């Protein structure tokens, strides 16, 4: 991720604002250690991306997303016809990643 950002910035030396980065987390699915589809994993991925972005002087902003989970066509990549990438559930209840973001953004 960090290397790809640097490569793109070398080719296009402009300020960067990165939006819509996340991974899926099924609401209420928790696992320690974290595992794919868990809220812990989503929070770690988003926090890790933000740490990388904060270390790049050419990155002037970021906004993980989407805000909330949303319906999609059913497939093996979309359990129960949902995209679970949101920081909040479809009903707008915060997932662990939303709480993690609040902590990061208050620093």
Predicted regions: what they are:
Residues 1-107:
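Substrate-binding clefts and catalytic carboxylate motifs of secreted carbohydrate-active enzymes
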């Amino acid at each position: 991720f960090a290397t790809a950002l640097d490569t793109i910035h070398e080719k296009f030396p402009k300020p960067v604002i990165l939006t819509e980065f996340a991974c899926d987390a099924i609401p209420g699915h928790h696992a320690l250690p974290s595992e794919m589809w868990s809220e812990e994993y989503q929070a770690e991925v988003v926090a890790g991306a933000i740490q990388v972005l904060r270390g790049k002087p050419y990155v002037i902003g970021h906004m993980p997303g989407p805000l909330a989970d949303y319906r999609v066509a059913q497939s093996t990549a979309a359990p129960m016809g949902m995209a679970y990438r949101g920081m909040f559930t479809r009903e707008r209840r915060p997932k662990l990643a939303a709480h993690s973001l609040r902590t990061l953004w208050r620093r």
